[in-house]
């Protein structure tokens, strides 16, 4: 998954959260999903396209008697397809970003012993759902040893709002 695809997921979820705060309305969710799909202008993973299609489906089919998805059904679709809890997505988003970053770093740099050791240590933290700490440790280790990371991999963590991770990432851009 590219950083662009991750951003699409996060932006879509953030938009849905705003709608959910106003109270769930299937028609508004369908319209938002339709408009997001049209205007996103970015690459979207298949899972996100599936969610968008399912949430806007009732809008297209209401004439034929289709019943709109309930709030629970819509939340279940998002959870099942994207593995993100719409009510509390923060942990799921950091998990998605961290796992994707590790996966691509492993594919690109696994022959480097320092990277391999940092990834191994991170996996131990992930077992305990310590995604922020795992990501911080990996970035710190890469920076300490001045290890160059390809820009497309480093950009995966752009979506993380943590100031310490942002500083580490900014420092790694210069390596």
What are these regions (language model features)?
Residues 1-175:
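Acidic, Ser/Pro/Thr-rich low-complexity regulatory regions
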């Amino acid at each position: 998954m590219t950083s662009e695809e991750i951003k699409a997921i996060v932006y879509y979820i953030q938009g849905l959260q705003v709608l959910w705060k106003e109270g769930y309305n299937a028609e508004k969710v369908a319209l938002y999903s339709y408009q997001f799909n049209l205007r996103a202008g970015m690459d979207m993973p298949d899972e996100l396209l599936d969610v968008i299609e399912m949430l806007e489906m009732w809008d297209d089919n209401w004439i034929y008697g289709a019943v709109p998805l309930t709030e629970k059904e819509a939340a279940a679709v998002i959870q099942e397809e994207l593995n993100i809890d719409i009510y509390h997505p923060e942990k799921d988003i950091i998990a998605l970003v961290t796992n994707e970053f590790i996966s691509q770093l492993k594919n690109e740099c696994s022959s480097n012993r320092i990277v391999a050791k940092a990834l191994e240590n991170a996996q131990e933290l992930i077992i305990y759902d310590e995604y922020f700490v795992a990501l911080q440790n990996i970035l710190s280790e890469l920076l300490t040893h001045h290890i160059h990371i390809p820009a497309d991999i480093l950009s995966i963590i752009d979506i993380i709002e943590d100031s310490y991770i942002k500083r580490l990432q900014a420092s790694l851009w210069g390596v």
